[in-house]
Curated annotation (Swiss-Prot):
Belongs to the beta-defensin family. One of its GO terms (molecular function) is CCR6 chemokine receptor binding. Neutrophilic granules. Keywords: Antibiotic, Antimicrobial, Defensin, Disulfide bond, Secreted. It is found in: Secreted. Disulfide bonds join C9-C38, C16-C31, C21-C39. SUPFAM superfamilies: Defensin-like (SSF57392). GO terms for cellular component: extracellular space. This is Beta-defensin 13. Has bactericidal activity. Active against E.coli ML35 and S.aureus 502A. Its main location: secreted.
Length: 42
């Protein structure tokens, strides 16, 4: 929760992926507003 930018996404072990996260990953926040998701594989 509270992940809303690329810096906090990366700090939490995530990567920024447009539109939606691929299947093994789960969304933990957003990066550049809602269209870009912050995704993590664990």
């Amino acid at each position: 929760s509270g992940i809303s930018g690329p810096l906090s996404c990366g700090r939490n072990g995530g990567v920024c992926i447009p539109i939606r996260c691929p299947v093994p990953m789960r969304q933990i926040g957003t990066c550049f507003g809602r269209p870009v998701k912050c995704c993590r594989s664990w």
